[in-house]
């Protein structure tokens, strides 16, 4: 029964993570469209995360009433604040990177995320690696295959990525820095959720931090351009509303998933966004679908399922170990997996 509940939960996490990658590509496309119309990326962040915070307020209220949570101490708030500051930095880098380049390049650069997250998780002992175990070998090889697949999609038959245009280089550099910080944020997120296991509350504090930091940055960056704050009834308004909703939901799902599966599992879905972006541009924008996109997509899929298999194998071993080490095969196991 417990095993069935865990499998059902893992299925929901898997589905939710795939959906968030689709939404992430959509958000990046909207941000590119809005900034092309003259809307400042800093202002997009301020408005969207303020709107997202307002949406989360009633959910936070019900979260406090519906479950028993630990006291929200100053130390925990500082932990959430650090997470919010890191998120502010990578969001500013990311949205400006998209402004200088494109959503496709943003998806392409995300392939550095699994590698950095995996390395950092091993260094800080949040992920165990034993090359004598098939599960560990599968995770390592799956990570490498996914990154290779992402690079194939990006570089094979992709002359635009080799352009010497300065804006494209600036955009790529900003996006690379963004995904390095995203890797760091996953580890901080896992630590934060361990101390305060409420995805909604953590997301609310995260949103407020981004809105405040970006408001300060926007006042400095756009002090001579008051028109940058004007929201028109066109794609700019749609971008602010959609980004506020999707980014808040995206982060709630991420914090929930990282508390159950760890930061490496979370990062492994990033290469999927490249495949999603390639297919989306083919369907909606009429761009050519090259052999490199197909080959890279196959490699990403193989690597993705290898890591999932490795994680599932480890989870199964943990469950069996918990059963065998417990004098009672019911109560302790149930206590371990309450969420």
From Swiss-Prot:
Q: Where in the cell is it found?
A: Membrane
Any one GO molecular-function label of the UniProt entry: transmembrane transporter activity
Source domain of life is Eukaryota
Entry keywords, A to Z: Membrane, Transmembrane, Transmembrane helix
Looking at the UniProt record for this protein, which Gene Ontology cellular component terms does it annotate, in alphabetical order?
membrane
Q: Main subcellular localization, coarse class?
A: membrane
Q: Locate the transmembrane regions by residue number.
A: 11-31, 42-62, 74-94, 104-124, 140-160, 168-188, 200-220, 233-253, 266-286, 289-309
Q: How does it sit in the membrane?
A: Multi-pass membrane protein
Q: Which Pfam families match?
A: EamA (PF00892)
Could you confirm whether the keyword Transmembrane appears in this record? yes
Show which residues constitute the signal peptide. Answer: none
What the entry lists under InterPro entries is as follows: EamA_dom, WAT1-related
- Please indicate if the UniProt record lists Ribosomal protein as a keyword: no
Q: What is this protein called?
A: WAT1-related protein At5g40210
Q: Which species does this protein come from?
A: Arabidopsis thaliana (Mouse-ear cress)
């Amino acid at each position: 029964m417990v095993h069935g509940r865990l499998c059902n939960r893992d299925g929901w996490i898997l589905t939710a993570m795939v959906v968030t990658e689709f939404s992430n590509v959509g958000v990046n496309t909207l941000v590119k469209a809005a900034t092309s119309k003259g809307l400042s990326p800093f202002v997009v962040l301020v408005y969207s995360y303020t709107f997202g915070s307002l949406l989360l307020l009633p959910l936070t209220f019900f979260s406090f009433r519906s479950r028993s949570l630990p006291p929200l101490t100053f130390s925990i708030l500082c932990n959430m604040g650090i997470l919010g500051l890191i998120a502010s930095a990578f969001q500013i880098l990311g949205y400006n990177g998209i402004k200088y380049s494109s959503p496709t390049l943003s998806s392409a650069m995300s392939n550095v995320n699994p590698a950095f997250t995996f390395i950092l998780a091993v260094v800080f002992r949040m992920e165990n690696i034993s090359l004598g175990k098939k599960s560990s070998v599968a995770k390592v090889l799956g990570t490498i295959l996914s990154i290779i697949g992402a690079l194939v999609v990006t570089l094979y038959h992709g002359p635009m990525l080799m352009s010497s245009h300065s804006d494209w280089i600036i955009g790529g550099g900003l996006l690379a820095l963004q995904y390095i910080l995203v890797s760091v944020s996953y580890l901080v997120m896992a630590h934060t959720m361990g101390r305060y296991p409420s995805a909604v509350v953590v997301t609310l504090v995260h949103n407020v931090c981004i809105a405040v930091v970006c408001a300060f940055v926007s006042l400095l960056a756009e002090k001579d351009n008051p028109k940058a704050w004007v929201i028109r009834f066109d794609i700019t308004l749609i971008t602010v509303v959609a980004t506020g909703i999707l980014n808040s939901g995206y982060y709630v799902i991420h914090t929930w998933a990282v508390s159950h599966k760890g930061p490496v599992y979370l990062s492994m879905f990033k290469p999927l966004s490249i495949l999603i972006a390639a297919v989306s541009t083919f369907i909606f924008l009429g761009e050519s679908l090259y052999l490199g996109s197909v080959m890279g997509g196959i490699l990403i899929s193989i690597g993705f399922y290898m890591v999932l298999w490795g994680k599932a194998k480890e989870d199964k071993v943990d469950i069996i170990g918990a059963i065998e080490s417990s004098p009672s095969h019911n109560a302790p196991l149930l206590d371990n997996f309450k969420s």
